[in-house]
Amino acid sequence: MINVLLVDDHELVRAGIRRILEDIKGIKVAGELCCGEDAVKWCRTNSANVVLMDMNMPGIGGLEATRKIARTFVDTKVIMLTVHTENPLPAKVMQAGAAGYLSKGAAPQEVVNAIRSVFAGQRYIASDIAQQMALSQIEPEKNESPFASLSERELQIMLMITKGQKVNEISEQLNLSPKTVNSYRYRMFSKLNIHGDVELTHLAIRHGLCNAETLLSQ
């Protein structure tokens, strides 16, 4: 039996995935959570073979939660299931320790195939995303995102900023000092040739790393 943990801050999304999986022989939904912090805590006291993880959630988010789970619970495989498929997110997520990467537009059977593949010790990347990653290696000048220059930590902080989180919130959730968070911010601004959080959010929207509604809600 493959025990699966669903982690997404939208109950409707979790319900849809649960309906897909509950009729699949050999797969069981072992739990449902709405944030990355709770996923890490859950894994300390419960057993999941596979975690289906959303990227953008309140708190530390899917990228940081994936990194923590992959490093601490080596037998638990994480599949990122997200609307964000643009470079450099897939590569950064896989580097953080994810075993798979899927778009939320994936067909139900592909989700099942991904779960079975990572449980068997393989990596699974949706074909369209894998093609995009390959093209970015073959023709980097045409396909590389300006965000590709960011480190994993910088990318995580960027995603939190574009959700409207402030420096103090980010420092508390990532267990960093506000000074350290600001150092990451200014390093990002320098790499991206921008001057503030609003410009950062606009740039992230243009490159498909966050939704336009994010800016409107700030």
Give residue ranges: language-model regions.
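Active-site residues of response regulator receiver
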Residues: 54, 82
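Acidic catalytic/metal-coordinating carboxylates
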Residues: 35-38, 60-64
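Active-site beta3 strand of CheY-like receiver
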Residues: 47-52
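Short, flexible helix-to-coil linker/hinge segments that flank and couple to helix-turn-helix
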Residues: 88-95, 100-152, 156, 206-212
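Basic, Lys/Arg-enriched C-terminal extension of HTH/homeodomain DNA-binding domains
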Residues: 189-218
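Helix-turn-helix DNA-binding segment
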Residues: 144-179
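Recognition helix of helix-turn-helix DNA-binding domains
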Residues: 166-199
